[in-house]
Curated annotation (Swiss-Prot):
This is Protein PsbN. It is a single-pass membrane protein. Keywords: Membrane, Thylakoid, Transmembrane, Transmembrane helix. GO terms for cellular component: plasma membrane-derived thylakoid membrane. It comes from the Bacteria.
Length: 43
């Protein structure tokens, strides 16, 4: 394969992996540990 193709596929895989991990962290089981700063702030 051409080196540009390999680089493009590599970058695409990294972007998709980061996006998937972000969605998993935001909506999956680890989201229980996330805190809402607006709920913690009392006025």
């Amino acid at each position: 394969m051409d080196s540009a193709t390999v680089l493009s596929i590599g970058i695409a895989v990294v972007v998709i992996a980061v996006t998937g991990f972000s969605i998993y962290t935001a909506f999956g089981p680890p989201s229980v540990e996330l805190e809402d700063p607006f709920e913690d702030h009392e006025d």
